[in-house]
Amino acid sequence: MAKIAWGRIAILLTVVFWITYVVTTIIREFIEAPGGFRFTMEAIGYLVVVTFLTFSATMYLLARQGALYRFRDHRRVPRAEIDRHFREHSGGITVLVPSYAEEPGVVRGTLWSAALQEYADLRVVLLVDDPVAPKSEEDRARLEATLALPGEIEDALRGPAARFTEARAAFEREIRSAEDPARGSEANPAASASPVTPAHLARLADDYEAAAIWLETMAEDEPMVDHVDEFFIDQVLMGLASELRLSLLALRAAIDQSALPDADRMLELHLRLERIFTVKASSFQRKRYASLSHEANKAMNLNAYISLMGHGWRAEESAGGTLLRRVEDPALADLYVPDTTYLLTLDADSLLLRDYCVRLVYFLEEPGNERVAVTQTPYSSFRGAPTRIERIAGATTDLQHILHQGMSYYGATFWVGANAVIRKRAIEDIVEIETVGGFEIATYIQDRTVIEDTESSIDLGAHGWTLMNYPERLSYSATPPDFGSLVVQRRRWANGGLLIMPKLWKQARDRRFRRERILVREMWLRTNYMASIAWASFGLLFLLAYPYDSRLLSPVVFLAALPYFIAMGSDLRYCGHRFSDIFRIYGFNLVLLPVNLAGVLKSMQQALTGEKIPFVRTPKVKDRTAAPAIYVIIPYLIVAFSLLTLWRDVLAQNWGNAAFAAFNAVLAFYAIRAYIGIRNSFVDIWLGMLNWLYVPDRAKATSKARAADASVPAGSAPATDAAGPASESAPKPVDWEGILYHGDRRLNRDLKRDNDRRRRAGASRN
């Protein structure tokens, strides 16, 4: 309660200090000492920057306050209620794990955490987006190892699944036999007794012990290479084993006390074991089929598989590749993709804790949640990161978990696509179908921007659906271990928010037209979520680069920011980090300033040109990823310019600006040393210079070859004369299938031919 009260005070103080600054500094200077045009423009610009930064700080405090309310009010659903709800549950769930050039060991942990989820009809599908025919032996070996993972998991679980399935079936047979109506007659007084016997309870306890031992044995055999492996062993495997042993303790206690659960509860306990170890795992490669979209992004990888669900497909070979044709009779299908009520999109470097599926689906099926389309627990970071940059990036991830929980309190939830449980009926409402090359391409999750989950959140809201975050930490995901991979991730995150803003405004207008109530706080939080990176980056750039008049500085600005930093430090300690990490995060944001600016500028470029920005996946490899040289050089320039500003302000006795410049210089240099590395930064700069100097080789065709190519129709062989072939190599056979399938594809090439001559229309008739 005290934390909630202090949170309210922090919001109030931030607003009061901002108003105080506007009145005592800006308005006062305008009235008492007008400074001309330049000072007026500086004052307006500085006020705009301070206002936007203060607004973002206030939104942080507001979202944090909502999270505190949710954590206070949350009550975990008892295990028995979940078991009762899912006893005869029929709605299946498909876990989709998109993967591209991932380390097989990383993907393996993700698949295991999904496969061990307790669910009645669980399917885990690995969506491999690697090239079907890798060029190198290393890539081929990695692809083969990745594709083999689903089969390995099914094989490993087949033994315990068969045992617990047979145990459950045997229990049901014995219970039905004991409840035979013939035995329930008045002549049989024992018929009124419970059909459950101590032998049933003892066998169930033995099964729980066997399940726990199986998981513990697997944990002992698992290699522990890094902190992610340690988390997988301790939290996924041993965590589940520990919970099963807790149930075993209860069963042993019931035996000792000569107590017997009823038949329904016994069946639920049997079903739990069976469902934990039962899974249908498979893999799918969309690039094997020419009729599916090959857009290089995660959203279309998911869309390609979702579009196949619930139908049978016949594979048809053509010159353009393998095509999938829909067939109505599943018996005639070469590929049948079962449909399920729910989907779970899971990044290839994420891990789920036990109960993730059952608790979130239970939440979706609670009364009043019929229009909730997506629910998830925003992922947290793995503990014990070996590098400073991974630890600080993880700290910011943990803060985002809190903020997303708070945004749900105000109805401003955004979908974070790493581990979302989705009601399939909801995304069928927002599907867009277009015809590309004669084939229908269904887009459920928008790929217009590289933050596809954010845009889909707006689309769902426009169709009357809502989103909600589940207030527990049940999912974890890896953070980039080096600066190069972090650049890729954060540049993508900074790109796209501005492009989606018009959709948000349109949704707000439509909701007002339908006379729906829209909270101002919801719109504030949504706007801040999508646009704060833009204004915060440009605002920080102005504060660093422009020498504002010292009369605009005031201690009140520092006081307005103080509640934000204190609250952030408190949240960091709550998440298991240090209070002093607020300074490390500030330096972290300084070195990421050029990355964020690049992402924002990319958004502006896309808005002006209409071109789709390529989706760049975050590298998930064990080797260090080199960062582009520009993102390494600019942090050094920030340090140099801050030192120059410090020197000028000291000479001018502008002590406020001097202190700010010194603060920036120290933290920026610390961030370079801690997060990039002095040696690594010079290596990346050198590699950037080499990449700029060298260009890839291109095959140079001779003019003779161009002329020959221009004169020979597509699919035809070169002409020969009596002396022999036209070239040293043997003529290629005519690709008759390609000609019949594609037709004449030379029209555009003919229009661009260099040796064309324009002639009068009647010249050819003369």
State what each model feature region is.
Residues 1-81, 97-100, 105:
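Hydrophobic transmembrane helical bundles of polytopic secretory-pathway membrane proteins
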Residues 85-129, 602-610, 703-715, 721-724, ...:
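Acidic, Ser/Thr-rich low-complexity segments on the non-lumenal side of membrane proteins
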Residues 1-14, 96-98, 103, 511-534, ...:
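Loop-to-transmembrane boundary segments
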Residues 496-517, 599, 675-676:
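C-terminal, non-catalytic tails of nucleotide-sugar-dependent glycosyltransferases
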Residues 22-52, 526-610, 626-703:
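Membrane-embedded multi-pass helical conduit in multi-pass membrane proteins
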Residues 480-495, 582, 611-622:
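Nucleotide-sugar-dependent glycosyltransferase catalytic core
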Residues 55-507:
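Internal catalytic domains of large membrane-associated glycosyltransferases
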Residues 139, 150-151, 156-218, 668-766:
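Cytosol-/stroma-facing membrane-proximal "stalk/adaptor" domains immediately downstream
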